């Protein structure tokens, strides 16, 4: 039922507030737990993203393979963030101009477009497979996620290679 998309958009807003306010509330109460909070926050973020992508793939909105492609792009950026946190002590949540807030707003906008536009009925036969317009939008989102990952990796790889140069090998 298409009306559940409003419920999912509400769930995204609820998640947004919970994700944003938990650390603020802990700091206000002076009960912050930086290590445990980081652990819980980011493992639950990964689980939430898996559930969102699974929901997309199980719905008529998007093919499962496209939803998993988006998930793979998101997880690559997440893993990259955690590696950079350890190696260069920089916790980066925004890539390009795309951060968690923009992603949530984009998901809410896509839900709204799916409800109010006839775009959900638009389908294309590409290489013998049926692709809906939202599948194509999903592939575009996945491509953007992977391009952000590759461009940031390339930039950081150069800087880290200079910071930690190869050592000569003497057998």
Name what the model sees in each region.
Residues 12, 23-65:
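Basic, amphipathic juxtamembrane/active-site segments
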Residues 19:
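S-adenosyl-L-methionine-dependent methyltransferase catalytic core, i.e., the SAM/SAH-binding region
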Residues 1-5, 9, 52-171:
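Hydrophobic alpha-helical transmembrane segments
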């Amino acid at each position: 039922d298409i009306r559940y998309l409003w419920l999912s958009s509400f769930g995204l807003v609820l998640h947004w507030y919970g994700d944003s306010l938990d650390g603020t509330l802990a700091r206000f109460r002076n009960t912050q737990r930086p290590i445990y909070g980081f652990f819980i926050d980011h493992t639950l973020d990964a689980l939430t993203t898996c559930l969102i992508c699974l929901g997309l793939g199980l719905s008529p909105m998007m093919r499962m393979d496209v939803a998993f492609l988006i998930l793979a792009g998101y997880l690559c950026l997440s893993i990259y963030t955690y590696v950079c946190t350890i190696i260069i002590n920089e916790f980066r949540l925004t890539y390009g101009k795309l951060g968690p807030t923009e992603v949530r707003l984009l998901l809410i906008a896509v839900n709204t477009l799916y409800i109010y536009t006839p775009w959900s009925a638009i389908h294309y036969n590409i290489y013998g497979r049926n692709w809906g317009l939202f599948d194509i939008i999903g592939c575009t989102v996945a491509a953007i996620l992977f391009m952000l990952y590759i461009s940031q990796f390339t930039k950081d790889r150069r800087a880290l290679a200079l910071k930690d140069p190869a050592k000569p090998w003497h057998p």
